[in-house]
């Protein structure tokens, strides 16, 4: 058994190495899965090798090493290795399917080795354990669907910037793997064919695994060619060439310049344009290659040979991926490296390049996130070299002798109001050290900078003529600086008390005029509102109404005029002459100069005054004290109970009430203000009778005599004497209007006979004129010549107020001679004078005694169309038999309307 064990162990090692090397993921797969990039919150550092061969060969430290290895295995791959001397060893391996290992055979081999003593064949066992740890380093851990390759210290496949950020402590600003390789090859410079003779790919892969696992000891490497292959592998696996793709075309153009000076200038500009990490790595590589070239007598590696080897590695054509197609560019690529090596001092020893190189060596300080203490800057005082040796602390860490009597100077801050808050009174120096090393700034509280809450106390002047308040009982020192900062410094000997959040109230200094007196604390809603001063009294009424509120839509109809009640001493009778010709615009009404209310009531619709009208107002008006706008002077009540209008053309109120006609038309838009009072006075009267274009006019007034009108002959009549027509016929467009007549006793008796004022002129003016019932002429009536009106059957003719549709509703009557009773010869159409001006509907009464009485009011008869046609035909036939008409005897042609009217009346 013991003789067969070594072959099985050897076979197991060989099988493991064979499968492991074949199944390792390629570099492209690792880069695609973003495996080699360390997390951002981790700042790893190069550690010494954990798996040294001496530790495995040492029996005393074997158990301790195994326990540490087991912990690492549990953290990385959830694998457990239990191994102890003199006891059975059970080995459970996970993720074996990823590497296609022979688990069953390995388990059988492990079961066979349970009875083997630890002292036998320790070299093979320790080697197996060592290789197994390397296997765990590159084993896969599956988290859901993501496969993570655990790499302790990745070196290959990372860009120079990533390597500098991951390993800030690396010497010379280059990865430590290059540093170790350069150190090893510097001892074997006389070896012939360095970088030209390839190394073993198997050895290069094992070295790469070993380096990324943390073992950088090359003392056991016997072949320098393997180290040269390791350097070439490092540059070949970079994500981009050391001279990036963006600079490839510029580099190729340099080779076509044709002179040494142009080569140097072009290459110098190319080097300065490279990223800092690439510049640092390129210079260190070229320095080492020049060292190799110095031993070219032994190693046979000249500049031409080196440039051919590294030209393809450091420069790659971005347009050609296939290496066979890029053979044409090999000469240009090698020429660039050749010129860099030949003119190294002229390129890299220039001042600008040296300055850029020095900047590239010093990387940015990484933040150690391995502990939560990085959130508290007070924890980093003197313990970490990156914080204890910063230039800021070296500048502000003064000696005890200089800090004894010198006022501390706060560090430069931004213009924002900030304060220094000491998180912990840590002191890393002796007893005389004044400053704490760790402070954190944050925005100052509003409590210290709001003068309305707490006033700024004036600084007390001391004998040292500074603005510092020095006390012996406290350890806080307040410094007034121009940028409004407050620095709190902690001294060492006295115990630092807790900061007092409530500042003391100091009495104000009356001699210091720049600081205001202390104000009481702010109270919410205690500022009274400023009273609104009353407006100045206006002397004119026009200024009071210059800006009225906008008109609002009416919410309720305006009250009718019938609801007005007569008031004593406030009855107003507007005068047309005074209202139109008055130039005095001054009023002394008390309501015009009253103090405006907080919210005045909305104006009425009938009382809105347009601001564009600047017509003066009659001072004789008695304006109601409740409103500031005058009431429209439409009509007023007098003591006699009648209604008098302001002008000759005002309509009769009773007729308006009988016809249910509104005073102001509501057909307009709702927001249009009603007409003004003086506009109503000047406007034409509201007529209810349309104009008849033909020779007959339907009049609403009684007969008019031919005597000249006189103002004394017209007087208003009481409204109770006005005849009211009820049961008016419904007008129709298609049918003729009904005829109201009393001339035919067979049809109806005691009915009204609406007649027209026959405006005919006679040759003789000796006829006795009759006194009219009412003489109310419009402006156009003065041009009408004297007319002769006849009375028929002593009946008063009056008409009702027709609607606009009943334009043809006419009642015709033929005038007769008062002496003979015969019909008067009607004049011709040329002699007939027609008044086209509508007469206003007025209520009239006789001015003198008249035997005529008011007729009785009854419902008029309505004749249908067929009845009127039959009646007209019958009357016309009878009349034709009795009095045949002829055109002789001085009579002119009679109009058909007069003939029809004559026949009907007969």
From Swiss-Prot:
Keywords in alphabetical order: Cytoplasm, GTPase activation
Biased composition (Basic and acidic residues): 92-117
SMART domains: RhoGAP
Chain residue ranges for the region called Disordered: 53-117, 368-415, 452-864, 877-906
Keyword Cytoplasm recorded: yes
Residue stretches of biased makeup (Pro residues): 494-510, 547-560, 708-721
Primary residence: cytoplasm
Gene Ontology CC terms: cytoplasm; plasma membrane
Function: Rho GTPase-activating protein involved in the signal transduction pathway.
Listed name of the protein: Rho GTPase-activating protein gacJ
Organism field: Dictyostelium discoideum
């Amino acid at each position: 058994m013991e003789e067969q064990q070594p072959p099985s162990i050897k076979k197991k090692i060989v099988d493991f190495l064979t499968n492991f090397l074949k199944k390792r993921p390629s570099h492209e797969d690792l880069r695609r899965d973003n495996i080699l990039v360390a997390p951002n919150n981790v700042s790893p550092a190069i550690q010494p090798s954990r798996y040294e061969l001496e530790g495995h060969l040492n029996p005393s430290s074997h158990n301790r090493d195994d326990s540490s290895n087991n912990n690492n295995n549990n953290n990385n791959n959830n694998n457990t290795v239990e191994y102890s001397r003199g006891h059975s060893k059970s080995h459970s391996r996970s993720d074996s399917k990823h590497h296609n290992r022979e688990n069953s055979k390995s388990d059988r081999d492990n079961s066979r080795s349970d009875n083997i003593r630890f002292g036998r064949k320790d070299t093979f066992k320790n080697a197996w354990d060592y290789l197994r740890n390397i296997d765990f380093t590159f084993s896969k851990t599956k988290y859901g669907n993501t496969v993570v390759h655990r790499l302790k210290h990745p070196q290959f496949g990372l860009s120079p910037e990533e390597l500098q950020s991951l390993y800030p402590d690396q010497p010379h600003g280059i990865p430590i793997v290059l540093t170790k390789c350069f150190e090893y090859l510097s001892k074997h410079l006389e070896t012939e064919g360095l970088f030209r003779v390839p190394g073993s790919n198997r050895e290069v892969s094992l070295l790469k695994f070993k380096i990324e696992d943390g073992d950088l000891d090359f003392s056991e490497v016997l072949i320098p060619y393997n180290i040269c292959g390791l350097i070439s592998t490092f540059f070949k696996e970079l994500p981009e060439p050391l001279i990036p793709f963006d600079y490839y075309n510029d580099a190729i153009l340099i080779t076509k310049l044709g002179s040494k000076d142009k080569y140097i200038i072009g290459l110098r500009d190319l080097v300065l344009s490279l990223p800092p990490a690439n510049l640092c790595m390129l210079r260190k590589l070229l320095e080492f290659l020049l060292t190799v070239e110095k031993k070219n007598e032994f190693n046979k590696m000249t500049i031409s040979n080196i440039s051919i080897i590294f030209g393809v590695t450091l420069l790659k054509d971005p347009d050609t991926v296939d290496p066979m197609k890029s053979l044409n560019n090999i000469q240009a690529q090698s020429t660039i490296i050749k010129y860099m090596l030949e003119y190294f001092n002229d390129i890299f020893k220039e001042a600008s390049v040296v300055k850029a190189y020095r900047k590239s060596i010093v990387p940015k300080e990484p933040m150690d996130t391995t502990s939560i203490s990085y959130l508290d800057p007070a924890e980093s005082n003197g313990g970490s070299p990156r914080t204890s040796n910063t230039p800021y602390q070296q500048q502000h860490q003064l000696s005890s002798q200089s800090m004894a009597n010198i006022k501390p100077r706060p560090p430069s801050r931004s213009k924002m109001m900030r304060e220094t808050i000491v998180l912990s009174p840590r002191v890393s120096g002796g007893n005389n050290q004044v400053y704490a090393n760790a402070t954190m700034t944050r925005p100052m509280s509003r409590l210290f900078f709001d003068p309305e809450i707490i006033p700024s106390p004036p600084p007390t002047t001391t004998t040292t003529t500074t603005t510092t308040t020095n006390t012996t009982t406290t350890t806080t020192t307040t410094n007034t600086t121009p940028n409004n900062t407050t620095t709190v410094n902690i001294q060492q000997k006295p115990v630092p008390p807790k900061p007092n959040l409530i500042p003391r109230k100091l009495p104000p200094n009356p001699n210091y005029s720049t600081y205001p007196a202390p104000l009481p604390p702010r109270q919410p809603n205690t500022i009274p509102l400023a009273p609104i001063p009353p407006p100045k009294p206006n002397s004119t009424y026009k200024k009071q109404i210059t800006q009225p509120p906008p008109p609002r839509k009416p919410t309720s109809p305006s009250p009718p005029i019938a609801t007005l009640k007569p008031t004593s001493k406030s009855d107003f009778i507007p005068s047309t002459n005074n209202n139109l010709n008055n130039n005095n615009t001054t009023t002394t009404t008390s309501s015009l100069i009253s103090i405006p209310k907080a919210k005045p009531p909305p104006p009425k619709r009938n009382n809105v005054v347009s601001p564009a009208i600047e017509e003066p107002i009659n001072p004789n008006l008695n304006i109601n004290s409740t409103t500031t706008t005058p009431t429209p002077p439409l009509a007023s009540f007098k003591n006699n109970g009648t209604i008098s209008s302001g002008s000759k053309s005002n309509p009769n109120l009773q007729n308006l009430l009988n016809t249910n006609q509104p005073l102001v038309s509501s057909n307009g838009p709702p927001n249009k203000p009603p007409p003004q009072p003086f506009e109503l006075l000047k406007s034409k009267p509201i007529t209810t009778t349309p104009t008849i274009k033909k020779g007959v006019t339907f009049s609403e007034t009684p007969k008019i005599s031919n005597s000249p009108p006189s103002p004394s002959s017209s007087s208003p009549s009481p409204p109770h004497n006005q005849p009211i027509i009820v049961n008016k016929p419904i007008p129709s467009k298609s049918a003729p209007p009904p005829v109201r007549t009393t001339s035919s006793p067979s049809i109806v008796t005691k009915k009204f006979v609406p007649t027209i004022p026959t405006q005919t002129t006679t040759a003789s003016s000796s006829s006795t004129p009759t006194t009219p019932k009412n003489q109310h002429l419009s402006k156009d009536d003065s041009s009408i010549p004297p007319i002769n009106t006849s009375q028929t059957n002593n009946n008063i003719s009056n008409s009702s107020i027709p609607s606009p549709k009943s334009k043809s509703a006419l009642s015709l009557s033929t005038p007769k001679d008062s002496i003979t009773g015969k019909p008067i010869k009607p004049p011709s159409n040329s002699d007939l004078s027609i008044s086209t001006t509508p007469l206003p509907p007025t209520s009239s009464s006789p001015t003198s005694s008249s035997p005529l009485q008011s007729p009785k009011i009854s419902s008029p008869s309505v004749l249908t169309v067929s009845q009127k046609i039959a009646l007209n035909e019958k009357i016309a036939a009878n009349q034709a038999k009795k009095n045949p008409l002829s055109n002789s005897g001085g009579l002119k042609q009679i109009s058909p309307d007069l003939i029809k009217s004559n026949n009907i009346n007969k």
